[in-house]
Swiss-Prot record:
One biological process term in Gene Ontology: regulation of smooth muscle contraction
Highest taxon in the source lineage: Eukaryota
Compartments it resides in: Secreted
Family named by the database record: Belongs to the NmU family.
Pfam assignment, any one: NMU
Transmembrane spans: none
Keyword Transmembrane helix among record annotations: no
GO cellular component: extracellular region
Modified residues (Asparagine amide): N25
Top-level taxonomy: Eukaryota, Metazoa, Chordata, Craniata, Vertebrata
PROSITE patterns associated with the record: NMU
Function text: Stimulates uterine smooth muscle contraction and causes selective vasoconstriction.
Name of the protein described by the UniProt record: Neuromedin-U-25
Length: 25
């Protein structure tokens, strides 16, 4: 897992090692 790469997870996005929850509307 690279911190520079944005990984799309279930209900959130992994960016720079931080999991930010982004609700799908």
């Amino acid at each position: 897992l690279k911190p520079d790469e944005e990984l799309q997870g279930p209900g959130g996005v992994l960016s720079r090692g931080y999991f930010v929850f982004r609700p799908r509307n």
